[in-house]
């Protein structure tokens, strides 16, 4: 093995990006099969492949950072830049949905009845479940900040408690969103209103599930004493992501639920 005279981590070849891409293909194809042919085989295969890929990839990253010490300060700096760029790309991703919503709602066409919401659409009451969801996510933003401060102060017990509260609030939000979808008086097929509503809120809900998974991994790592006040970028990245999800929901609530109703 050649001597390494620099502080950067030269990552070894890994199969997980390939299996991750394969799982994405299987999952999206499986969703199509489920929607049109009511077959869940391909979807379940994709989700299982995705879960196994996440487990193996996280395992490798934990080994490299916690046990082998490859995540030096320059490497952590690069990871921070990477996470910032990723969140920036997510901002533009959601900007597309907001653009579609405002393009349709600010100048409704005659086909929509000339007003917004379109004729025949009964919007959800923004002061019922959506307001509760807003409170839940804002509370989770407070608890994740509490967890971060507890970690910086080496208060392990409070960090675990706050992280667990955040995860439970994330799960509660997801359940509330699912119940709202089931009871909604319109569907994704109901024109531009249904399309923009379910695409924007649905992708946000997916991000909440991803964030909850991210935080659950952080909780498991904290229980195994992986984080210190000086070395905890995995948790920091999860906290950034969660705050991003919070902010996106506030824009969704004000735009689609409140103003759009």
Swiss-Prot record:
The record's section on InterPro entries has: Cyt_c/ubiquinol_Oxase_su3, Cyt_c_oxase_su3_dom, Cyt_c_oxidase-like_su3, Cyt_c_oxidase_su3-like_sf, Cyt_c_oxidase_su3_a-hlx
Q: Which GO terms describe its molecular function?
A: cytochrome-c oxidase activity
Q: Topology: which residues are Mitochondrial matrix?
A: 1-15, 67-72, 153-155, 224-232
**From which organism does this entry originate?**
Pongo abelii (Sumatran orangutan)
Q: Which GO terms describe its cellular component?
A: mitochondrial inner membrane; respiratory chain complex IV
Enzyme class, broadest EC rank: translocase
Mitochondrial intermembrane topology: which positions?
35-40, 106-128, 184-190, 257-261
Q: Which GO terms describe its biological process?
A: mitochondrial electron transport, cytochrome c to oxygen; respiratory chain complex IV assembly
Family matches, as PANTHER family: CYTOCHROME C OXIDASE SUBUNIT 3, CYTOCHROME C OXIDASE SUBUNIT III
Topology relative to the membrane:
Multi-pass membrane protein
Q: Which UniProt keywords apply?
A: Membrane, Mitochondrion, Mitochondrion inner membrane, Translocase, Transmembrane, Transmembrane helix
What CDD domains does the database record attribute to this sequence? Cyt_c_Oxidase_III
Assembly mode = Component of the cytochrome c oxidase (complex IV, CIV), a multisubunit enzyme composed of 14 subunits. The complex is composed of a catalytic core of 3 subunits MT-CO1, MT-CO2 and MT-CO3, encoded in the mitochondrial DNA, and 11 supernumerary subunits COX4I, COX5A, COX5B, COX6A, COX6B, COX6C, COX7A, COX7B, COX7C, COX8 and NDUFA4, which are encoded in the nuclear genome.
Domain of life of the organism encoding this protein: Eukaryota
Q: Which reaction does it catalyse?
A: 4 Fe(II)-[cytochrome c] + O2 + 8 H(+)(in) = 4 Fe(III)-[cytochrome c] + 2 H2O + 4 H(+)(out)
> What is the documented function of this protein?
Component of the cytochrome c oxidase, the last enzyme in the mitochondrial electron transport chain which drives oxidative phosphorylation. The respiratory chain contains 3 multisubunit complexes succinate dehydrogenase (complex II, CII), ubiquinol-cytochrome c oxidoreductase (cytochrome b-c1 complex, complex III, CIII) and cytochrome c oxidase (complex IV, CIV), that cooperate to transfer electrons derived from NADH and succinate to molecular oxygen, creating an electrochemical gradient over the inner membrane that drives transmembrane transport and the ATP synthase.
This chain's protein is named Cytochrome c oxidase subunit 3
- Provide the E.C. number(s) assigned to this enzyme: 7.1.1.9
């Amino acid at each position: 093995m050649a001597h390494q005279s620099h502080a950067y981590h030269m990552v070894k070849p890994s199969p997980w990006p390939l299996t991750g891409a394969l799982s994405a293909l299987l999952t999206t194809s499986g969703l199509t099969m489920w929607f049109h042919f009511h077959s869940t085989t391909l979807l379940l295969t994709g989700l299982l492949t995705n879960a196994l890929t996440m487990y193996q990839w996280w395992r490798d990253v934990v080994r490299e950072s916690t046990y082998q010490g490859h995540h030096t300060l320059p490497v952590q700096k690069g990871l921070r830049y990477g996470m910032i760029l990723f969140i920036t790309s997510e901002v533009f991703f959601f900007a597309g949905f907001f653009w579609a919503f405002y393009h349709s709602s600010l100048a409704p066409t005659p086909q929509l009845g000339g007003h917004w919401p379109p004729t025949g659409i009964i919007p959800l009451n923004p002061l019922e479940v959506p307001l509760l969801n807003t409170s839940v996510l804002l509370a989770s933003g407070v608890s994740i900040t509490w967890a971060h401060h507890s970690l910086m102060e080496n208060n392990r017990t409070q960090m675990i408690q706050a992280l667990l509260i955040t995860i439970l609030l994330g799960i509660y939000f997801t359940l509330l969103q699912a119940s709202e979808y089931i009871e909604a008086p319109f569907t994704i097929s109901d024109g531009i209103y249904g399309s923009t509503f379910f695409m924007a809120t649905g992708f946000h809900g997916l991000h909440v599930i991803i964030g909850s998974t991210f935080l659950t991994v952080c909780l498991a790592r904290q229980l195994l004493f992986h984080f210190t006040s000086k070395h905890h970028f995995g948790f920091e990245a999860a906290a950034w992501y969660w705050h991003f999800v919070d902010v996106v929901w506030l824009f969704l609530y004000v735009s689609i639920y409140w103003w759009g109703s």
